[in-house]
Amino acid sequence: MARVCQITGKRPVTGNNVSHAHNKTRRRFLPNLHSHRFWVESENRWVRLRISSKGLRIIDKKGIDAVLADLRARGEKV
């Protein structure tokens, strides 16, 4: 499964580890993803999403029904 947030689209980015001596080695910065279950009252079922912490805040703000409508409009199966 790809490390991508289903709501925000956040994905891993690349950068450098920088030591005290300023040596640089390549690394990946991974998004803070969590698999989370949401109860959707209108559908009377649970929906499992892989979302970042930012995505969780978006759901708190807009509501799960509005977010699911946006996902379905984008063509994602939920």
UniProtKB/Swiss-Prot annotation:
Keywords: Ribonucleoprotein, Ribosomal protein. NCBIfam families: L28. GO terms for cellular component: cytosolic large ribosomal subunit. This is Large ribosomal subunit protein bL28. It comes from Thioalkalivibrio sulfidiphilus (strain HL-EbGR7). One of its GO terms (molecular function) is structural constituent of ribosome. It comes from the Bacteria. Belongs to the bacterial ribosomal protein bL28 family.
